[in-house]
Swiss-Prot record:
Highest taxon, organism lineage: Bacteria
Upper classification of the organism: Bacteria, Pseudomonadati, Spirochaetota, Spirochaetia, Spirochaetales
Coiled-coil intervals, chain numbering: none
UniProt-recorded name of the protein: Co-chaperonin GroES
Subcellular location: Cytoplasm
Segment forming the signal sequence: none
Function: Together with the chaperonin GroEL, plays an essential role in assisting protein folding. The GroEL-GroES system forms a nano-cage that allows encapsulation of the non-native substrate proteins and provides a physical environment optimized to promote and accelerate protein folding. GroES binds to the apical surface of the GroEL ring, thereby capping the opening of the GroEL channel.
């Protein structure tokens, strides 16, 4: 499936949260912390408002975006304003 964001939206593939602690204890899905970072997969057509490009790693607001599953992997469809920083 291919998703093309519109306007000032950005499609981000979210980073996976840790499933095990350093000591080897498995963390259940319900207790895993929601990740606030990911990789930009696609950028909407209103690109002059969005200061990120495909392939960059970004941090985003914790409760922002609409979750989307693409080929079994978690993604978020975010507004450009919900991106807080670029990770270098």
């Amino acid at each position: 499936m291919k998703i093309i964001p519109l306007a000032d939206r950005v499609l981000v593939k979210t980073d996976k949260s840790e499933t095990k602690t350093a000591s080897g204890i498995i963390i259940p899905d319900t207790a895993q912390e929601k990740m606030q970072s990911g990789t930009v997969i696609a950028v909407g057509s209103d690109s002059e408002k969005i200061k990120v490009s495909v392939g960059q790693r970004v941090m985003h607001d914790k409760y922002a975006g609409n979750p989307v599953k693409i080929d079994g992997e978690e993604h978020l469809l975010l507004k450009g304003a919900d991106i807080l920083a670029v990770i270098e």
